[in-house]
Amino acid sequence: MQDTRTGLTPTVFRLTPPYTRFEEVANLDALQLPDLPLGSVLAIELPGHDGWADVAALAPRLRVRFPSAPVVLRVRGGAGVDPEEAARRAAPLHLRAVLGEDAPPRETLQAVLTDPASLTHELDDWLTVRGVAPPPELKGLIVDIFRQAPAYPRLHGLLQALGRPERTVRNWFQRAGLPGPGSWLAAAHAVYAALRLQRERQTSLLTIAVECGYSDHSSLSRQAVRLFGARPGEIRQTLGWEGLLDRWLGRAGVRAA
């Protein structure tokens, strides 16, 4: 997977919970989805100040191959790159974070990957990467459902606020071969709860469950298992929403690209 424009091959590392160690991926072509447990992150190391073309070529390919794993940039001191410049150049590539040589990986990743704002900011592009490509209006509605989900426990109220007829919307999703809008709303609620679990590791499961609209911690636990195949305790050790949404789509029968 080499970019012949510079002849440099960026090294890719895998981080898995508890995100304390960079594990080099020796053979990227042999890496498979089962090799990436829930919460995995892939880090592309900038091979030098002139290596941006290589990173730009590799990043979208990794994101398409492994939509369940956020892709980030790793910059070591020897690369000679200003951190602000690295962040500016990484953003258009949808590299979710920039990991410096001295910063603890988990702390840096947690601040970015559990931010609810990043979900709605990145969701449109991520759906395309995942192979979910409905008409633009329908994709925009999916993003709106996620954006508005914290304020609306029920679909009817949300669609009413958006000025969308519920029957028409259900027909749109059915024609696109996607889970219904109510299922997307349920997934959104569960993802927001998951992000809080990841971000607020000392807050009790009951508190998060109730504040996220569930009757109790058992209700949230059942929903997490049903949608994501993972219990809250497991989710709490991970970071990011990509793996959760990828699992939910897979369990709902929406195949990856």
Each PLM stretch: what is its role?
Residues 1-36:
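Extended, compositionally biased accessory segments flanking or bridging domains
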Residues 24-36, 154, 216, 231, ...:
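Alpha-helix N-cap recognition
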Residues 26-68, 73-86:
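Conserved phosphotransfer microenvironments
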Residues 65-148:
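Compact structured core domains
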Residues 133-180, 201-212:
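DNA-binding recognition helix and immediately preceding turn/loop
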Residues 170-184, 224-232:
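HTH DNA-binding helix-turn interface
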Residues 176-212, 239-257:
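Terminal helix-turn-helix DNA-binding modules in bacterial transcription factors
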Residues 200-236:
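Sequence-specific DNA-binding recognition helix
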